[in-house]
Structure formats: structure tokens, C-alpha cells
Amino acid sequence: MSRIAKYPVELPKGVEASIQPDQITVKGPLGTLVQSLTGDVNVAQEDGKLTFVVANDSRHANAMSGTLRALVANMVTGVSKGFERKLNLVGVGYRAQIQGDAVKLQLGFSHDVVHQLPAGVKAECPTQTEIVIKGPNKQVVGQVAAEIRKYREPEPYKGKGVRYADERVVIKETKKK
């Protein structure tokens, strides 16, 4: 059995989990998330905890038990607390603003970039050069942040571009004669 899967996932107050043979659904104050299950891992709910047991003794089943436990733990955290990712816009004239369910970005192009947000994801702009992406699904929040960053990745000479708040951009030295 995977070392990660040995530990049960505790369900905090306000979070419910329902287990069907092919999927697990986690409901909480911030939304509902669904994860498909494989036949290699059995999930049981007892005393407000979810336990993961390997159905057969294959290497694949062992690996899937740890993966599934981590995914479900992220689902429980997401529907109770949520996830957020912060982006900074570094550059002269780089700005962001929220327009309904989209983020409008001015990134030095001749046109504005409008990025549509998927369902369940919210964005805030505390300042014109900061974007905070929030949502219950960790994968989707990270994906949206990566897509926005992809429009103008930080360049290595001046550091201009869209970067994660915790990202360190290593600045290269320019070529000398």
C-alpha cells in the first residue's frame, strides 16, 4: 500500500462525501467536486474519515491509491477553504481588470487580451498589477493561472511579464563588448 494512502482523509464540518462504485462526490460550502474512481482502489467512509484500500496487489493499484488519496484530499480542502493563485504583472503599462467572468489584460500588445474564466473560478484585481485567481478545484485554478501567465512570460533580461507572486525570475546579464 502507498505510504500516502495509509493516512485517512478527515472531512471537516460542512463537508459531505458520497461514494458510488465509479466516482466520489465531495460537497462543501464552496461547491461540489467529482472524481472518477478506478476498480483498483476501494474507498470507505467511516466516522467522518475516508480510507483508501488497495483492491489488488499490483504496482499500478498501489500507485493509484496514493494518487487518489491526494486528489480527494485536495477536493476536501477545495470545497472547505478553496485555493488561490496570485499573479503579478511587471512592466510599464501592464494592467489587468475584471470584466464580468473574464480578465482583461493590457500586456504591451497592440490589442487587449481578454481571458474567459471557466465556471467555478473567480478572479480579483486588488491593484492594477495583481490578479488573484480563486476556486475550489486546485487543478483548474492552477491551469487558469498558467494560461494567463502564458500570454507574456517573464523575460530573462528585464523581468517584464506575468509572473506568479512567489516566482523568482533570474535576470541575465546583457552581452558586453
Curated annotation (Swiss-Prot):
GO terms for biological process: cytoplasmic translation. Disulfide bonds: none annotated. GO terms for cellular component: cytosolic large ribosomal subunit. GO terms for molecular function: rRNA binding; structural constituent of ribosome. It comes from the Bacteria. Pfam families: Ribosomal_L6. SUPFAM superfamilies: Ribosomal protein L6 (SSF56053). InterPro entries: Ribosomal_uL6-like (IPR000702), Ribosomal_uL6-like_a/b-dom_sf (IPR036789), Ribosomal_uL6_a/b-dom (IPR020040), Ribosomal_uL6_bac-type (IPR019906), Ribosomal_uL6_CS (IPR002358). The keyword Ribonucleoprotein applies. This protein binds to the 23S rRNA, and is important in its secondary structure. It is located near the subunit interface in the base of the L7/L12 stalk, and near the tRNA binding site of the peptidyltransferase center. Part of the 50S ribosomal subunit. Belongs to the universal ribosomal protein uL6 family. NCBIfam families: L6_bact. This is Large ribosomal subunit protein uL6. The gene is rplF.
